[in-house]
Amino acid sequence: MRVLILAKEGERSETGTPPTPEAMAEHQTFNEELVKAGVVIGSGRLTPSAQGKRVTFDGKKRTVIDGPFAETKELVAGYWLWQVRSIDEAIEWLKRAPYDGGSFEIREVSMSEGA
């Protein structure tokens, strides 16, 4: 099954401050383990919401809103796309992740036709 892992953070992701070299090394090691196990399909870190846009839909009306999106307590800061046997396997991998804050949301990717 494919799952999308959404990394959610608060203010820390909005500052654009890079992690310490030690934290970067820990993240790199963890990502290498995921790749070696054949779990990772794709991944990425997102820029702060100040650089983003939001498009809202109301019937036929489309509205573009410039970031930052300060009204949101948690923002998506990054993602992984994984191939795993089960949600439980994804949870076990996430428990090993070298993070000291934020949260992760695991969502199964629908493989239905037309999706």
Model-predicted regions and their roles:
Residues M1-A115:
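Conserved, structured core segments of small domains
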